[in-house]
Amino acid sequence: MHFTQREQDKLMIVVAAEVARRRKARGLKLNHPEALALISDELLEGARDGKTVAELMSYGKTILNEEDVMDGVANMITELEIEATFPDGTKLITVHHPIV
């Protein structure tokens, strides 16, 4: 089985997001890469489910809060951009200040 670079990148997001979900469920605070992966995965899945870019931009701000992440992580992530596949093509989702 051969994956394109884009497919490999998406698989890495899924794996990192699953690690982040398990750690969050155990009550651990997420670090920078874990927080990015979790939010990104939720956005990618939302696009797959048929949500609009506008809906996902709003939803992206509700996934994590400052209590879910290590000190300073929320301030490090001022913007998240990810390309997602929608029923009508690939679009860029941008979430400003995703961790409030």
From Swiss-Prot:
Pathway: Nitrogen metabolism; urea degradation; CO(2) and NH(3) from urea (urease route): step 1/1. One of its GO terms (biological process) is urea catabolic process. Its EC number is 3.5.1.5. Keywords: Cytoplasm, Hydrolase. One of its GO terms (cellular component) is cytoplasm. It catalyses: urea + 2 H2O + H(+) = hydrogencarbonate + 2 NH4(+). The keyword Mitochondrion does not apply. It is found in: Cytoplasm. The keyword Hydrolase applies. Pfam families: Urease_gamma. GO terms for molecular function: nickel cation binding; urease activity. InterPro entries: Urease_gamma (IPR012010), Urease_gamma/gamma-beta_su (IPR002026), Urease_gamma_sf (IPR036463), Urease_subunit (IPR050069). Heterotrimer of UreA (gamma), UreB (beta) and UreC (alpha) subunits. Three heterotrimers associate to form the active enzyme. Belongs to the urease gamma subunit family. This is Urease subunit gamma. It comes from Staphylococcus epidermidis (strain ATCC 35984 / DSM 28319 / BCRC 17069 / CCUG 31568 / BM 3577 / RP62A).
